[in-house]
C-alpha cells in the first residue's frame, strides 16, 4: 500500500483547484440505475474512486451491464434485462453505501438478498431505519448468516417518520417508493444536496418525487422508470477540504465549481474564525492570514448543519488557530480517532465523550501516522502541511475511497508532497 510523504512547515497554497463529482452522490445514483427497465442511464462527472469501482461491481453483479469510461468520467448502465435478487457479498462487504441497492432491487424484483454492509468503521452505524421504513411499505425482512433477506409481493405507499434524518435510509426509501403502489411520505427526511441530486435523477427517469431538500419528501409511485443522462453534483466535502487546506496554510485558493449554498455551514465557521471567503463566478475563493485565525466552537449536525464529513479536516484547521477550540460530534460516535494520530505530531487535545478540545497555535512536528478512516486521512495530510519536518501518512486505502488525485492537486497548489510505494510490511 502506498504512503504519502509531506515536507511540512512552508506550504502556503496558492492557485486554483477543480472539484470532482460527489462521491456521496454518485453511489446512490448508481444504485438508482437498477430501477430503469427501459433504456440506458448515463451518469456524467463521475469521480474515479475505489468506492465507485466497487459500486459498479455491485450493480454489474445484479445482471446490469456497466461501462465506466474513466477518461470521460462517464458511466453507462443498461439494467433492461432481468435483475437478480442477490447483491454479491464479495463487493457489498467492502462498502457500507452498497446497502442502498436494497430498495431498488425490491422495487424491480420484489425480493432481495443483500449482505450486511462494510466500509468505514465509524461507530455502530445501524441500518434499522432502512429496514423499518421498508417494513412500513409491506416488506417482510429477516436477517440470517450475515444477509438481509427482504420480500414483498408488491410495495405499497406508506407514511414514514424517521427517528433520525439518515441519508442512506432516505435514499433507500425514496428509490423503493418510486415503483410502489400509491403515495409514500417520508418525514424527518435527510436534506443533504446529495438527496436533492438523487431526486433530480429519479424524476428525470420518470419518477414523481417532491420535496427533496426539505424535511418532508413525497413520492407517488409509477409503473416503470426509464434511462436518462444525468450530471453528478459537485463534491461539497472535497470542496470543503480544499477550503480548509487554503485556510490553514495562509493560502489564497480558488476552488472551482464549488457551490456556495452547499457549503454554507462550513463557510460560516471559516468566516467566524477570521478566514476570508468570497463567492466568485467560477467557484469559491479562500484567503487566509494565519495570525488572524481565532479559536471557534463547532457542532456537527445533519444538513443544513455543519457536516460530520468535515469534522476531521476542521479539527486540523483548529490546530493552527490560537486558543482553545471545541468540536462536538453528534452524528457518529467514535469519530475522533484521527486526534490520537495527531497527538503523535504534538497536538494538545482532550476528548470527553462527544467533545474534543483542541489547543491551537502550538508547534507541531512531522511524524509517521496511520489514517483511520476516509476523512481522517485527509485531515492527517493537511496537518502534515503545517507541521515542521516530514510527515508520512499510511493506510491510503481510506483516502482513495473518497479523493481523486488528492496529493497531485495539493502539489499543484504548492505543497511539498508526494505519493510513494511502500512494502506491505511497512504498513
From Swiss-Prot:
Positions of phosphoenolpyruvate binding: 23-24
Primary site of residence: cytoplasm
Annotated Pfam families: EPSP_synthase
Modified-residue entries (2-(S-cysteinyl)pyruvic acid O-phosphothioketal), positions: 120
GO cellular component: cytoplasm
Enzyme Commission number(s) of this protein: 2.5.1.7
A GO term, aspect molecular function: UDP-N-acetylglucosamine 1-carboxyvinyltransferase activity
Record CDD domains: UdpNAET (cd01555)
Record keyword Lipid metabolism present: no
Pathway it works in: Cell wall biogenesis; peptidoglycan biosynthesis
Catalyzed reactions: phosphoenolpyruvate + UDP-N-acetyl-alpha-D-glucosamine = UDP-N-acetyl-3-O-(1-carboxyvinyl)-alpha-D-glucosamine + phosphate
InterPro entries with a match to the protein in the record: Enolpyruvate_Tfrase_dom (IPR001986), Enolpyruvate_Tfrase_sf (IPR036968), MurA_subfamily (IPR050068), RNA3'P_cycl/enolpyr_Trfase_a/b (IPR013792), UDP_GlcNAc_COvinyl_MurA (IPR005750)
Binding sites annotated in the UniProt record for UDP-N-acetyl-alpha-D-glucosamine: 96, 125-129, 309, 331
NCBIfam families with a match to the protein in the record: murA, PRK09369.1
Function recorded in the entry: Cell wall formation. Adds enolpyruvyl to UDP-N-acetylglucosamine.
Alphabetical list of HAMAP family matching this protein: MurA
Similarity remark: Belongs to the EPSP synthase family. MurA subfamily.
Protein name per UniProt: UDP-N-acetylglucosamine 1-carboxyvinyltransferase 1
Organism this protein belongs to: Streptococcus pneumoniae (strain ATCC BAA-255 / R6)
Name of encoding gene: murA1
